[in-house]
Amino acid sequence: MKGVEYFMKLPDQLKDIVYRLLQEPTLDNFRNFLKGQTGEHNSIDFKEKWIEPTKLVKEMLAIANSGGGIIIFGVKEKEDKSFSYDGIEEIVDKAKISNDIKNYISTELKYEVYDFVYDSSEYEKLQNHKYQMMVIKDCPRFIPFMSMKES
């Protein structure tokens, strides 16, 4: 994926991992991304589960207006800065996500959703769990993004 400049503020050890994940969103690269986590950053957010569409739109707008980023669903950052990798119950259909938010965001706000399902993994915490990752792209030409409808 082109335009990953929004991750330049990340710690060096995380930059390469994020870059690889965005270039090739594979199970292995996602696992390495989770293993290398140092906590939430301006461009990376973790959600224990999918949030209601109006809250999701607010998150997406904030991230888009800050230069793009990632929301991970199925991972929770705890108060002690450790992580819970419980996953989400079901993979949410991309058409449903699009339908839920389309009335709130401009078509200029570009995003992609990736699915990660681990039936087995060498990283035990991920076994039998499902995750989704939303990548909100950096589109500086269209900033500021605003909700198209009151949420």
Set out the residue ranges of the language-model regions.
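Conserved N-terminal catalytic/coupling substructures associated with nucleotide/phosphate chemistry
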Residues: 1-151
